[in-house]
Amino acid sequence: MTNEEALAKINGRLTFGMKPGLRRIKQLLEELDNPQKKLKFVHVAGTNGKGTTCALTASVLRQAGYTVGLYTSPYVEDFRERFQINGEMIPPEELAQEVELLSPIAEAHDAVGDTVTEFEFITALAFHWFARRQCDIVVLEVGLGGRFDATNAIDAPEAAVIASISLDHTAILGDTLDKIAFEKAGIVKPGGRLVLYPWQAEGIVEQLRGICEERGAELILPDTRYQVLEESLEGTVFQTGGETLRTPFLGEHQVRNAVTARTALEVLRRRGWRIPDGAIREGFAKAFLPARMEVLSTAPLCLLDGGHNPGCAAALRDALERFVPQRKVGIMGVMADKDSHEALRLLAPLFAEIITIAPDNPRALPAEELARTAGEFCPRVRPAQTCGEAVARAMKAMGPGDALIVCGSFYLAGEIRDQLKGKLANLQPDRLPQKM
């Protein structure tokens, strides 16, 4: 089986949609001899911030000398970004081997009407690959929610982490914060340990405290006292617990995510993991997360952000107001199932001009519809039919010293990255996961 055939097999499962529940994934794993039981995990849920928390935690553990698996989503340019060991993507031939092994098992379920979803398939694949490669520990990002997410087929992790909780995927997870928090709390196992991002909406911390008490789990809340010492487009230096740390990430929310990750690492230390202070400093400084306020170019300034809900939009607005005072041109594309009106209300007034585009995804909002909404908040908005057209229009609209901001969807970020690379000078070094 070739890599292309493997990807086609995986993508073919997208037609089976989303079917929350753990029965199918547990059956798949049982037929693979339960690879997840041979692994240790840090399990991370949350609406916003879980990607940063995963990236920081995995980076530190790698600096500490461990073989670290990372399972995350979404990808930006290459599907294989979702499966990494020590910062390197699964090789094409190994992805093909895993798909070839798993396909007959999944197809047997399909044949009796118990179809295996794409996420269940790739989660089982990830566990099997990480176990085969003998990872010391895996940083595991929840796909959606937590309670019925396929990643929750694991036993109690070394640490569970819940990042910031806000309204998203309300049709599936519920239309109130307490309903969504309950779903996220599904990753808390009896007798386990939960590190909870403490800057939650009112009532969420107490709700999670009660759930932990019911399950005999320990709740660990990070110290909310920290001090930002320096911040720029190059990153942030902050102090927490007498320790000075630097991350390449922008915004106060990212400092809070880093404080949460730092607390999770302390829980691992208590569990016997050897994590020197130097590994924490180096790991935080070297962590990378594509398309999260990523500086793609410095002259002209180009920022790439895949955030897709109002919470992400608010964080991006804050960063733009603080770090990007110059005239801004935007390229925006969103999914139809997201609250684009609220995101545009927050962001669009900052732009002199916006070009809208529909990302290459069946759920994408048409560019014309997005342009109509954006036009309520920005004086000049034009739809484009292709990424190439959007980039060309944006570059034409920019004057000397202007900034280009690409935002609204990870699907858009991945599509447009190569288009921008061919047209921007002073590109930052490409830090996407390396190929094995």
Feature map (PLM): residue ranges:
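C-terminal helical cap/extension that packs against the catalytic core
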Residues: 198-220, 232-234, 301-302, 310, ...
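N-terminal leader/targeting and accessory segments in enzymes
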Residues: 1-48, 52-67, 76-78, 193-201, ...
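Beta-strand->loop->alpha-helix junctions that form or flank phosphate-binding loops
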Residues: 71, 196-199, 211-232, 248-252, ...
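Active-site-proximal loop/hinge segments that shape catalytic or ion-binding/gating pockets
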Residues: 409
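ATP-dependent carboxylate-amine ligase catalytic core
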Residues: 22, 26-37, 63-155, 171-173
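Nucleotide phosphate-binding/pyrophosphate-handling subdomain across enzymes
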Residues: 38, 137-140, 148-161, 165-169, ...
